[in-house]
Amino acid sequence: MKKIPLVFSGCLLGLVGAGNLLADSLPFLAHAFSLTGLFFWFFFVVYHAIRWQETKIELQQPALLSGMATFPMAGMILSTYLLRLFPAFGGLSQLVWWSAFLLDLGLILYFTKTHVLARPRANATPSWTVLYVGIAVAALTYPVVGIREIAYLALVIGFGLTFLLYPLIYHDLKQSPLPSHLLGQEGIYCAPFSLLLAALVRVGGASLPTWFLLIMVVASQGFYFFVLTRLPKMITEGFQPAFSALTFPTVITATSLKMAQGLLQLPFLTVLVWMETFLCLLILVAVLGGYVAYLRE
């Protein structure tokens, strides 16, 4: 059996994100995804801790290290599941949340020091948005700790870095395109605006102006449909571990649309929510199946 690659962390985030998406509509399936994500999250920690010397060498690659923010992001979402599962043990959920949040911050600071401020600067890739905008998961999950100020700060940082990173990534990829084995990272393009939309709805709720919600929905969906146009090229290249980058972005896009629709109440969006929910689950299961086949080769 092959070594479980670090990029599998993206599937962990996809699994727990799917559990969160289905929590109020298909609770049995939501538990299945969340528990599977919880199991593999802990397994992933132990597996790579045992092989730390190998893992440490792999983490020297900027494109890989930046994508590892999916691990603490999954931890923050898992904390919300633990709170639902064990409401009497709120301290456990808060411990997981704070540990994941601080790990995410530490990863951001370390990456910035070693790969952004260093000269020459590493080429920006789509996974940079996972690292820098992914902190907005703190705003999406802030009720676990109940500190709104963290949510506001995470949103401000997320928005600011989104508008900074897209042009930078575009510029760098024009100079140095993604290699074929990293094409799956193109799935990340739809994640930032979708995550920010979901976090905004969580924090702002009904106080959000309708026009602003619509702008965010259009931005989120625009990048989502762009990603869908890239799928045929990715598929023709054959399965790659980097396909894990397709899981959470499509899940959070469906989640954000569902949350926004709860406020907008536009009939045609209901159909779109169910279509995107089905598609993101199909992608998640297909990628997990691809991993099973890949690891058994």
Give the residues covered by each predicted segment.
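Aromatic-anchored, glycine/proline-accented short structural segments
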Residues: 158-216
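Short hairpin/turn module used for nucleic-acid contact or packing/dimerization
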Residues: 264-297
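N-terminal signal-anchor module of multipass membrane proteins
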Residues: 1-48, 288
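Hydrophobic, membrane-facing alpha-helical anchors
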Residues: 41-57, 98-117, 136, 159-173, ...
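Helix-coil boundary and interhelical linker segments in multi-pass alpha-helical membrane proteins
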Residues: 20-30, 82-94, 140-152, 200-212, ...
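Juxtamembrane helix-loop boundaries in multi-pass membrane proteins
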Residues: 1-19, 54-80, 97, 113-140, ...
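Structural signature of hydrophobic alpha-helical transmembrane segments
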Residues: 29-43, 90-105, 148-162, 210-221, ...
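Membrane-interface capping segments at transmembrane-helix boundaries
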Residues: 49-53, 229-233, 289-297
